[in-house]
Amino acid sequence: MSFKKITEMMRQAERQSKQKALDFEQKLFEYSYKNAAIKIIIFGNLTIKSITIDPALIDPEDKVTLEEMITEAVNEAVGDVKAKYDQLMEEAMPQMPGLF
């Protein structure tokens, strides 16, 4: 395979992966935490669109537990979206025999 052909294939792969990344950033993901006690809607670019909390969790006497649950739920959602992004980028890069 010629160097020119390899270079063009790499450029095409880069364009495709950039487009996939842009599409992913605009995609919405919905996560439920603790049997939907906390629901998070998050974009692929990790911007939170909304957080919904089951009213049964709201105890004015125990604010700390709710804060901890929200923090844990957000961290899980962010981690899941990052993992999906990493998987998408891994799949987007073509396997070119003889290069690596």
Swiss-Prot record:
Coiled coil: none annotated. InterPro entries: YbaB-like_sf, YbaB/EbfC. It comes from the Bacteria. One of its GO terms (molecular function) is DNA binding. This is Uncharacterized protein MG134 homolog. It comes from Mycoplasma pneumoniae (strain ATCC 29342 / M129 / Subtype 1) (Mycoplasmoides pneumoniae).
